[in-house]
Amino acid sequence: MAKKMTFGWYHGMKAGLLGLLSCCLLGSCDSLMHDDLPPCFTGAYLHFVYDYNIQRADMFNDHVGGLVVFVYDENGKFVTRQEAANSSLAQPLKSHDFAMQLQLQPGKYHFAAFAWQKAYSETLAARGAKFRVEMPQQGEDISRLHATLDRQQGIVENQAMPLDTLWQGLSKGIVEVKSLEMVHDTISLVRDTKELTLSLHQIDAPADISVEDFSFEITCANGTIGHDNSLWEDERLTYKPYFTWDTDFRDEAGNVKERTAHAAMMFSRLVLYPVAQNEQNAMLSIFNKKTGEEVVR
C-alpha cells in the first residue's frame, strides 16, 4: 500500500511541476494570460562590429553614430528597414551591448547596412558632399541597393568639409527567424571612405614653398558603392583637398628656415586594378600653379 501511495505522489508532483512550467512559459510570452506581462517577440537581434581597421580592434561604439539596416527575404526582395542613431538625449550605439531589435515574421532573411558618424538625416543636412542611399521600394531586389556620392559635373564639391565617414556591412548568410524566438546575427562593417594627407618639402630652397602654389586632385570612378561593397560603373570623379596649410620651421631669430606644404583629402574607397585595366586606377596629380607643371603623377 505504501508503495502505491509513493508512486501516486511522485506522478502527481511531476504532473504539477509540468503544469506550473507550462503556465510560466505561457504567462511570460506574448501576454497570453495577462495584459500586463511583457510580449514575446519574433525576430532578430543584430549586433555590429567595426574591427577592419589598423588598430585591429572593434571600434564600432567609438566611431559609428548612426546606421540604417535593410531587410530582405531569402529571395533578395526588400521587406523593411530600420534606423538607429545617437542623439543629444541618448547614445545607444555607444553601449558595448548595443543590438538592434527587429520584429519580423517567421522566415529567412538577409540584412544589409549602411552606417555614418551620425544619424542619416543629420548627415544629409550637413554641409559638403555626402553619400546618399536611394531607399528601396517593397519587393525591390537587393542588387539595386547602393550609396552614391554627391558630385557636380564630375567634381566632388566638399565645401571645405571632410566626407562624413561611410561604412557598409552585409549578413554573411541567410538568417532564419522562427516563431516566438529572437535569433542573433552579427554584421561586420567596412569603412568605405579614406583619408590622405599630402606633404611637400623642397630640398633646394626649403623655405621657398607654399601650399598656395600648388593644386591637388585625385581622380577615380568610385562614387557608387553597392550593397555588397562593390564599386558600380560610374563616371570618373575629381576629389580636391578639403583643407590645406603650411608648417614653418624657424630659427631662434624667428626666420623661416624650412616650410612644408600640406593638403588633407577624403575620397571613396579605391581598388587596385591589374595592368591591363590601368586606366581604371585612381590617379593623384599635383600641379605647380606658377608654372603649370605637373610635379607629381
Regions found by a protein language model. Give the residues of each.
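C-terminal motif of bacterial Sec signal peptides marking the signal peptidase cleavage site
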Residues: L25-S28
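A short beta-turn/strand-edge loop motif at beta-sheet boundaries
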Residues: A57-H63, A205-E212
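Short, low-hydrophobicity acidic/polar segments
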Residues: K77-R191
